[in-house]
């Protein structure tokens, strides 16, 4: 008789220890031996109850002790044993991202369970760094430790206010520090950082070596499918003036891909993830970043003080529900919900979004995608356009967009701006107060099949063009 594992969701998973696609007596024997001899509480009790705790692997959670190694062991064990990982109340300090793998459930005691990054250290590089280099020279090495996670990212020459564009980002682990020559050696090459669209680049002098990193991350050649994260507080511990680091959202899913503007080839896959009842604060980039194929459900989360976006969906992404969340930005940049490069079949419903540059946006380099619904949300004190869909082009048109029944307070710029959009409905939206009266409330240009009706909009002498529909056709 063969006993299966039982997960928290009641699923039965028969162990395939040898990863050969078959379950055999040898597998079961190896599993029993492993359960009896492995350090920690990985025994029959752990497998039968369907969960393990990070405390079983030595995590302290006192906000002082570095819990990185203990947390890594617990994450690895949970993935290996197909059991849930419980993180009890406490503050767990880490200095490297914790790796998510397929089928993992990670949960805690709500806001009482905090995973917090060690404060980031960064220095501007003093030399041009080749794309395959393993050694970086920095102006100073104070604050670095062997074993730290580190990234190379573009600072855009603007370290004083943290406006770094953070392109060409590379991840490694510091393996050696030479205090004589101010050099840092790290494991792994930089060719993942070949550029957003696959063009090989050298890292110029205006790049930064930074210990900023994601907290929970899937970024490898391994598949990551069906992760469930809930009831945790993740603190990115972003420092004042810290340069942004792309790929360093508090939760970051990113498959190994080869990509350009017209073609995306996945070398691994990531999809079907649930994030619920989490508090995500002080991120070095996005609160949640999902760069995989799709299938994302973010529900009842609080996201505060992200350096960039609240929730970021991208790279030919489809099928998402972002519902019931409260997102607060930093007024300078980013969007509450960011549609990046052809997002389709996303429902943005019942969220409260404030203090971002945009409420919902395809800002940067994407089209608007198709068949997206933005409804029943509350937006307040958005610095620029509340709904910004201006990045579609004549040759890569967006469309199938429904924006309805949203409420906006503290309007400072245009309510809705879009171009090269087809089949758009903008209806029953209400502006309840205005901070700065824009000259154009709605701007939809070079578009076809646009319905604008039933909205409650402000009026005033400064509104010279309530609706700008230049070069648009079939406008209702």
Where are the regions a protein language model picked out?
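Acidic Gly/Asp/Thr-rich repetitive segments characteristic of extracellular carbohydrate-active
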Residues: 54-88, 142-147
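Autoprocessing Asn-cyclization modules and mimics
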Residues: 113-194
């Amino acid at each position: 008789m063969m006993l299966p594992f039982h997960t928290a969701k009641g699923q039965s998973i028969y162990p395939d220890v040898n990863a050969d696609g078959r379950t055999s007596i040898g597998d079961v024997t190896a599993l029993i031996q492993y359960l009896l001899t492995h350090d920690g509480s990985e025994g029959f009790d752990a497998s039968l109850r369907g969960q393990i705790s990070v405390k079983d692997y030595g995590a302290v959670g006192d906000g002082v002790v570095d819990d990185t190694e203990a947390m890594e062991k617990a994450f690895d064990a949970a993935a290996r044993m197909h059991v849930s990982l419980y993180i009890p109340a406490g503050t767990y300090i880490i200095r490297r991202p914790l790796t998510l793998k397929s089928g993992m459930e990670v949960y805690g005691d709500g806001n009482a369970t905090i995973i917090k990054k060690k404060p980031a250290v960064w220095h501007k590089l003093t030399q041009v760094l080749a794309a395959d280099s393993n050694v970086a020279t920095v102006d100073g090495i104070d604050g670095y430790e062997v074993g730290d996670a580190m990234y190379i990212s573009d600072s855009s020459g603007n370290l004083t206010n943290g406006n770094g564009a953070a392109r060409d980002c590379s991840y490694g682990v510091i393996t050696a520090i030479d205090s004589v020559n101010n050099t840092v050696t790290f494991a792994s090459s930089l060719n993942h950082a070949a550029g957003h669209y696959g063009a090989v680049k050298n890292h110029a002098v205006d790049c930064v070596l930074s210990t900023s990193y994601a907290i929970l991350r899937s970024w490898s050649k391994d598949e990551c499918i069906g992760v469930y994260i809930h009831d945790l507080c993740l603190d990115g511990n972003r420092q004042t003036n810290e340069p942004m680091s792309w790929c360093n959202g508090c939760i970051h899913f990113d498959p190994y891909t080869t990509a350009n503007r017209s073609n995306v080839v996945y070398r691994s896959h990531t999809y079907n993830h649930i994030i619920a009842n989490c508090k995500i604060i002080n991120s070095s980039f996005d609160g949640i970043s999902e760069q995989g194929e799709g299938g994302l459900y973010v529900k009842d989360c609080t996201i505060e003080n992200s350096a960039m976006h609240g929730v970021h969906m991208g790279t030919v992404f489809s099928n998402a529900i972002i519902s019931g969340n409260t997102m607060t930005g930093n007024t300078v940049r980013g969007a509450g919900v960011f549609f990046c490069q052809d997002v389709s079949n996303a429902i943005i419903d019942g969220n409260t979004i404030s203090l971002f540059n945009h409420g919902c946006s395809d800002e940067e380099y994407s089209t608007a995608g198709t068949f997206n619904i933005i409804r029943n949300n509350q937006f307040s004190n958005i610095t620029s356009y509340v709904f910004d869909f201006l990045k579609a082009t004549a040759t890569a048109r967006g469309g199938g967009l429904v924006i309805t029944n949203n409420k906006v307070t503290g309007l400072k710029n245009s309510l809705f701006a879009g171009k090269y959009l087809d089949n758009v409905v903008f209806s029953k939206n209400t502006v309840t107060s205005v901070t700065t009266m824009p000259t154009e409330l709605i701007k939809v240009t070079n578009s076809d099949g646009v319905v604008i009706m039933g909205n409650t909009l402000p009026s005033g002498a400064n509104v010279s063009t309530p609706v700008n529909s230049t070069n648009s056709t079939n406008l209702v």
